[in-house]
Curated annotation (Swiss-Prot):
InterPro entries: UPF0250_YbeD-like, YbeD-like_sf. This is UPF0250 protein Psyr_4360. PANTHER family: UPF0250 PROTEIN YBED. Belongs to the UPF0250 family. It comes from Pseudomonas syringae pv. syringae (strain B728a). It comes from the Bacteria. Signal peptide: none annotated. One of its GO terms (cellular component) is cytosol. Pfam families: DUF493.
């Protein structure tokens, strides 16, 4: 991949349809904690909300789209999600 290819894949903000995937331990409060953080930091498209458990039920994935306004916002979301204690990975 060339430098030109990398630059052409850079996200342009605001991005009205930015996908977020959050993976964490399956627990009663996981989805609520994820939603609380996302709704605090961004406009959330609830129509895109999808929740799925792993085959063994140990992990849950929450996916949805947000309005992303910039890299600082995305860093803040990542930090806040990890601070919940539920989250293993944010994609």
């Amino acid at each position: 991949m060339t430098d030109t290819d990398i630059k052409s894949h850079k996200i342009e903000f605001p991005c009205n349809d930015y996908p977020i995937k959050v993976i964490g331990d399956t627990s009663v409060g996981f989805t609520a904690a994820v939603m609380e953080v996302l709704e605090k930091h961004a406009t959330v498209d609830l129509k895109t909300l999808a929740e799925r458990q792993s085959s063994n039920g140990k992990y849950t994935t929450v996916q949805l789209h947000i309005v992303a306004t910039g890299e600082d916002q995305l860093r803040d979301i990542n930090s806040a999600l990890r601070a919940t204690g539920f989250v293993h990975m944010v994609l």
